[in-house]
């Protein structure tokens, strides 16, 4: 999916300007049509005014104090859906439970299009539709798309500290 990203910034005198206006490319995940489009992110809390340049990003999820925004496109599930999700999330995924993962982030997930399921540790799944919002507090979870078309979710993640690793306190 093509996404137009408009970024604001400041001149050296502090005046607000459009720093960039361009399309952002998607990164395909597997061969079934799922993708991620990184909209913006940074490893630090930021300081303004700035010129609107893209800050550095060191990982797929931000460290404490960092943030990231992305659009996830989830293809309808098939037999291999969670296997390729697991492979794409390898450092954060549960190797024994395909698709389950946990990150040290506070996530704000907004369903833009389609119907998705959010499953937590207890196996209970909540069904979400366009306009629904999930506040994900570093919990172990997996996403489902049980429909027959692509589902789109805007995910804004804020890096946090987490005292649980792999389901066990650290």
Region locations from a protein language model:
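Conserved short histidine dyad/triad with adjacent acidic residue
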Residues: 23, 55, 68-103, 137-140
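Short acidic-glycine-tyrosine-enriched beta hairpin
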Residues: 120-138
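Short, conserved beta-strand element in jelly-roll/cupin
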Residues: 73-75, 101-118, 159
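A short acidic/small-residue loop/turn micro-motif
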Residues: 24-26, 124-126, 142
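A short hydrophobic beta-strand segment most commonly corresponding to one strand
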Residues: 107, 133-142, 148-165
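Compact, glycine-rich, soluble single-domain proteins
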Residues: 54-61
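N-terminal leader/capping segments at the start of a protein or of a new domain
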Residues: 1-52
């Amino acid at each position: 999916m093509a996404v137009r990203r408009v970024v604001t910034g400041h001149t050296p005198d502090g005046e607000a300007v459009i720093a960039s206006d361009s399309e952002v490319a998607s990164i395909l995940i597997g061969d079934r049509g799922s993708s991620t489009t990184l909209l913006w992110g940074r490893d630090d809390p930021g300081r303004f005014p700035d010129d609107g340049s893209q800050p550095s990003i060191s990982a797929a999820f931000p460290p404490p104090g960092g943030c990231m925004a992305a659009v996830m496109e989830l293809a309808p599930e098939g037999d291999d859906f969670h296997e390729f999700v697991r492979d794409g999330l390898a450092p954060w995924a549960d190797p024994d439970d395909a698709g389950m993962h946990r990150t040290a982030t506070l996530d704000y997930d907004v369903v833009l299009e389609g119907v998705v399921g959010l499953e937590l540790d207890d196996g209970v799944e909540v069904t979400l539709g366009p306009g629904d919002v999930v506040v994900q507090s570093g919990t172990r979870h997996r996403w489902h798309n049980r429909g027959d078309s692509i589902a789109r979710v805007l995910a804004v993640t804020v890096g946090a500290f987490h005292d649980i690793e792999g389901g066990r306190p650290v």
